[in-house]
């Protein structure tokens, strides 16, 4: 889908045009029975790339509506030449998750939470979730994980016993990557030792110390994707859209594409 074929439809509002600028609504209208769309069926597009009218971004990996049918995966050869099946599968499940009412932190939109082992987490979208048995999991978090209080982290506990099947990669005091079982002690503050007292670390890199929760995605999933209808005498509520900021440049920096 080159950008010239997916211009924004004129009949939609300004807010929606900014996020549906790829023309998905028009493509769906031409190729998908409206009765199915209005009765809970989903609709997705495998695209090469799209141009966001608001930012001009061309190499986003996709876009999805939150709690409403409609998403697109755009990891095509123009910007994502060499993208493997892991990238395609992870991005597909990520964008579908938005339709199923999931956000980047599951129940919230705090991204990058290390113990949130879900492809909704940008950390795991392109690569899958590393498991202790050497495999990678492409899916949603299926159990509650311990809450991490960034201002008082217990290094001895790691991510707790629930994280025993997962791996965690972090930097050591010399800046080298260390991969270890996530339920073992973790040197969060990178001082070379496991501290006995709580430490304060911004684990998800958002610049603030926060309480990072990671509840099971199964508690948040909503399979009723029927589009919102207009209220009495009111306009149709516009769906919230999530343009994916993970780009081909990010994949290239990770060594995932040439």
Each PLM stretch: what is its role?
Residues 1-117, 121-126, 170-185, 197-200, ...:
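Active-site-proximal segment of zinc-dependent metalloprotease catalytic domains
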